[in-house]
């Protein structure tokens, strides 16, 4: 039975009765067959619904319900309006309201979040898709680090991060990506790292060198990671080799080869793989071995040539004996050609991937057939009871690897954290910049310039290509230097390089200055080059000077003198000026050297400082056929003032004046100042009366050697400044020209000749004046000569050789004229001891020079050629040295005097 409330709720409010006659019967039938508790409203609604089903939707849309019916359903009429739901029979009961659910605690929320997270991760389908916002919300609710859910969440984040970093590594970003990789816990995730690296390498073999370089960097700090990766690769190779899986074998061997190149794996690992592959050769195994050898061959040749030789010998045997396909044979032949080319297309390590110093690398050796543990359990998540302690340990290790101030924020999605991370990353990148001191950039630049020069057909093309080369700042001087060096290495000079230098210098002032500096550099270091290179360099710069590509003021670095030049520099100057004269012509070159604006820069080539340097320059240019350039120097040398006379020495008691000679020294009579070449002191007196005709056997006993300083006193009564000449065939060693002045007091007869009846003939001329005077001679003796037709009869002592024992020299009778001798004849001294009929009135030799002629000893030694002029015969009383040997002298014998310095005075 339904309650009255239910009936009221289902039945609408009563309607007024219909006036139609059928209404009572319809009402009676309902009341007759139905329970009185049911309301007729449901029947009407059912009929209306059946009618609506028969009608179309459009008809339903345009068939509005009766507003009276809707009003009845919306607001049913109740008897008790204040009761809230009753009918006219019973009042409505009070409604029960539900109590709110109790608030969940924090523990309950954590538990619910963990349960939901576990349900999502452990679902049978592998985990349903969870929107990122909901996943982050779930993760944010899990904050307990000791819980498995939190560690599982951190493990998933670590896996995604390592996998993402390995997948995006390339040559350009490998350096900044290394710190990001170390920011992840690679000790906990070393299995994930190895797994991701192997998968990424197998998917893209051309990127194997990049992955190997990344592993090499990690291996320097975490060697256990590199060792684990090597063990897994070896196990992967062994499994694939047994299964005949060529693709896996190829990827594993390629990765191992590049790890060997990076010195992560020992070269014996690659050697074992090669020997295993070539033990029973098949087409696939030989192909894999060829690929492995191509990658690791250069490293084996350099580090362990024995392994390389064994492997290539095995390849040679396979090529000749094994039954393999033509394609495989061709691969082996190509491999041998690659080895012949020194693996130039397969370098061991590319320059941009050489990130680790050789000393920092750690090698791992793994036996190919040994017991290896892949540690596959590191690939899956495991709960760590000491999670926080292990994380703190890795943070300390990370600080040691990256530095104290290089920690990275975990939240990479936050823009603020990203901007704050940029500064430490930039600092770390700056700290990791490697200073390349191997000059690799310089070598590459010089190679580029050289190849550009060699590949050009003409100078215009070469200059056009050279101008396109991007020269780093500070290395602009390499271009002129390499042009000169390329020119120098040619067998003969090529105008190709001269034209290049000329065009470069005329394009920009920068190149002009650089070529001028190059000229100075090469001139100062020209002695380091061989003759052929020196010639090419000189001709190159000769072309530059002749074409006015560089300024002539550069010639100021040349100082043409004996002290500052070498044989190489003199050859360089010669070839330089010959090239300039051939290009310009001698008249233009002469005009250029006489240019007034260039004279300050030509002082080194044509010096004006000393006579010696001027003569050196004149002789140099004359010897190379360019004497016309030295006309001004010759004129300057002729008009060059002579230097002042040197002051007499303070210990000289000479009464006569001394004169200057530019080539030889001076001798002073009555002085103790020595002459420049040979020095001795002697004093001789001569007293002779010269008759009008005398036959005398003159004896000259002189002990003074050549260049002696003599003191002689002659007395005559009449001064007779008349020139006289004495000729003697015995030439003394003292080459002196003596000038003497004397006043004679004795009468001097006129000159007279008589045949000499002595062994030595003398001929002298004395004036006819009679004078008596005491004279002091002043002698200047550069190269005096005395000529006699026979030597003096100086007794047995004079006919002996001097003490010096010098070898005799051939005499030459040269007629050399000397200045006047103004010593008067007719002295008071007696005549010589031996007299013969002599055609001369004065058998005297060079009395004024201290008995130099008297010191002439027989022999063939060359004596100093001198002329003496005297007007009276004299006999010197200075004793001659003791004879060392006697020798018969003829009419053309020469006298030699000892070179030893002796001072001896005898009166």
From Swiss-Prot:
Q: Name the keywords, alphabetized.
A: Cytoplasm, mRNA processing, mRNA splicing, Nucleus, Spliceosome
Q: Hey, which family's this protein in?
A: Belongs to the CWC22 family.
- Superkingdom of origin organism: Eukaryota
What does the UniProt function comment say about this protein? Involved in pre-mRNA splicing.
List the InterPro entries: ARM-type_fold, CWC22_splicing_factor, Initiation_fac_eIF4g_MI, MIF4G-like_typ-3
Annotated PROSITE patterns: MI
Tell me the Gene Ontology biological-process terms attached to this UniProt entry.
Answer: mRNA splicing, via spliceosome
Compositional bias segments (type: Low complexity): 655-674, 687-731, 753-772, 817-830, 869-879
Q: Which residue intervals are annotated with compositional bias (Basic and acidic residues) in the record?
A: 1-10, 43-56, 68-81, 837-850
Task: List the biased-composition ranges (Pro residues).
Answer: 13-22
Q: Which Gene3D superfamilies match?
A: 1.25.40.180
Q: What is the recorded name of this protein?
A: Pre-mRNA-splicing factor CWC22
Alphabetized SUPFAM superfamilies for the sequence: ARM repeat
UniProt-annotated stretches for the region Disordered: 1-114, 405-433, 639-907
Q: Summarize subunit and interaction data from the UniProt record for this chain.
A: Associated with the spliceosome.
Report the GO molecular function annotations: RNA binding
A GO term from the CC aspect: cytoplasm
What compartments host this protein?
Cytoplasm; Nucleus
The MI domain sits at 444-560
The main place the protein resides is cytoplasm
List, as start-end ranges, the regions of compositional bias called Basic residues: 675-686, 773-783, 898-907
Q: Where is the composition biased (Acidic residues)?
A: 406-425
Q: Which residues form the MIF4G domain?
A: 159-342
